[in-house]
Regions:
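Hydrophobic (often cysteine-bearing) scaffold residues that line and stabilize catalytic clefts
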Residues: 83, 136, 170, 174
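Auxiliary, metal-adjacent structural segments of Zn-dependent hydrolase domains
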Residues: 59-120, 184-191
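Short pre-active-site segment immediately N-terminal to the catalytic Zn-binding motif
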Residues: 123-139
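Active-site recognition of the HExxH zinc-binding catalytic motif
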Residues: 137-153
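Post-HExxH zinc-binding segment in Zn-dependent metallohydrolases
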Residues: 10-12, 152, 158-207
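Pan-zinc metallopeptidase signature
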Residues: 196-249
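Short His-Asn-centered micro-motif
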Residues: 108-112, 126-130, 149
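N-terminal low-structure segments adjacent to metalloprotease catalytic domains
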Residues: 1-78
Length: 249
């Protein structure tokens, strides 16, 4: 019998929120621009000094967010449960791998944050406030990452957790393949929606060939095992040019 994970929504604590914001303020990734997003959401952090405590600065806004959105956990659970089982089974079929038994429950933290970080070891990810369409998009996006990395463990036995985080090529690939996988026929039958990866990937050309056109073709015309190997090898072959163009350098 297939294991079908469930999502458990919760509110991020003040400390968890502070830790995420602290991480984003140190980030220099041109693809995500998470620092910019944090300063837009929290302009008061532009004046942050080494002596300041982020928790103290954001505490009032955190408390107001929790007070004003105390029904989000139940609302999100109701919205997502309509799709959970069908999606979990279909994405499992696509990757030709069962959800590992450790994935009984996946924690989803809700907070006043500008990003949606995921935690592979902890089997969790975080989100900010979203409408129904954004919520489903984000949950399907993040869950696709989890099973993609499980498939990579199977294909690449010498894997390590660092392979699944930025700036590794497998991390880049995990973000790019959101387009061909979530726009596949099986997923679209469950939720009709145009899924997109990060905008910057659509503008990358290698040897005068559009990156997304190349990757989409690979996933459309091959088994998932072959597609992952071929797309990863393609990025490795053009790694220097790919990274440079992704970072606008």
């Amino acid at each position: 019998m297939n294991n079908i994970p469930k999502l458990k929504f919760k509110y991020l604590t003040l400390e968890e929120t502070s830790d995420i914001l602290s991480w984003t303020l140190k980030d220099t990734d041109n693809i995500l621009s998470v620092k910019e997003g944090t300063l837009f959401l929290y302009p008061e952090l532009k004046r942050l000094t080494k002596e300041d405590n982020i928790k103290d600065i954001i505490q009032d806004r955190y408390n107001n967010f929790i007070k004003e959105n105390n029904n989000l956990r139940e609302e999100y659970t109701t919205i997502w449960n309509e799709y959970n089982d069908k999606y979990m089974l279909e994405i499992s079929n696509y990757f030709n791998i069962k959800w590992p038994k450790e994935y009984k429950e996946i924690s989803v933290g809700i907070g006043l944050i500008p990003v949606c970080p995921r935690y592979i070891k902890e089997k969790a990810f975080d989100i900010h406030k979203k409408n129904k369409e954004e919520l489903i998009d984000t949950c399907m996006h993040e869950l696709c990452h989890f099973l993609f990395f499980e498939k990579c463990k199977e294909i690449y036995p010498n894997w390590k957790y660092e392979d699944f985080d930025s700036p590794s090529l497998l991390w880049y690939l995990s973000e790019i393949i959101i387009d061909p996988i979530l726009n596949s026929d099986g997923i679209q039958k469950i939720y009709k929606h145009k899924f997109k990866c990060y905008d910057i990937f659509y503008n990358v050309e290698i040897d005068n060939i559009n990156l997304l056109d190349k990757i989409i073709s690979i996933y459309k015309n091959n088994s998932i095992e072959t597609a992952i190997k071929e797309s990863y090898n393609y990025l490795k072959e053009h790694e220097e040019e790919f990274i440079r163009k992704c970072n606008n350098k």
